[in-house]
Amino acid sequence: MSRALIPVLTVGVILTACAPKPPEGVDAAALDEAVARAVGSPSTCVVVEKRGGGVVYRYGTHTTCARSLPACDAPGLTTIQVQLDAARTGKVRTASCDTAAEASRGVAWASGPLPVLAGKSDRQMVYAVFMESGDALSGL
């Protein structure tokens, strides 16, 4: 999943040009569709923020993205916001684990800084993603 996700997010960053909305001429629905094909489900959340804060792109509802889910690589729960904050420090993270005792559902996390576009050092961004479902990829 992480290899499929990076190109989608990179394209998303290029298309959104650090604006809360895609630039003129970019179809936000097409970007959402590309994310949906790569990792989408009703329980998927993808957030790209400026390194200093401010949402550039969100896939998933606010309710979905506000969920607290198992951290997988540490005790307790974590959130998209905690992962975005860690990504701002340069931390890259991938983790997955079961969310149901009988292993019927799982969560997969990925987060980190996005590559800086050539000549665009003022456009540093971070991302955080989770997918929680029966289809969440293990060993992300």
Residue ranges and their predicted role:
Residues 1-16:
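Sec-dependent bacterial lipoprotein signal peptides
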Residues 18-45, 50, 55-140:
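Non-catalytic interaction/Regulatory regions outside core domains
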